Amino acid sequence: MTSTFHPANGSFEFLDSTGYNRIPIVSWLKSNAQEGLGHAHKAGELVTLLGGHPSLKIGALLETEKHDIGDILRESLEHENGALAAYYDLLKISEGNSVLLEEFAREMLVQEELHLDEVNKMLRRPGEIEPFKE
């Protein structure tokens, strides 16, 4: 995989998704997608437990129509931040009302923070230890 660092704006651009890192990156993305489906299933079960009916609608998709790895990872970072905020909201609402929902929110927060960390590390320039910032 080739990449370019743009010192003027501090951005790091991945130019393609081929080469030595293609298979691990594709595998990682597939694994995250499968995990996301598992999260959706758990959430649906909780909605049903609470007497509701899970929606089959899909929310807004964060598609930029750009398909290099850097763009995909930045989209993933945005998605992880949104999920993290939603789970913090759920935790705040459920605290003192439902131990089950509190624990679900905490479990999801741990997983989302770990995902956020993984994506952040992948977006850093080689050798960079500071967190990625756009």
Indicate residue ranges for each PLM-predicted region.
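Iron-associated oxidoreductase/ferritin-like identity signal
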Residues: 1-134
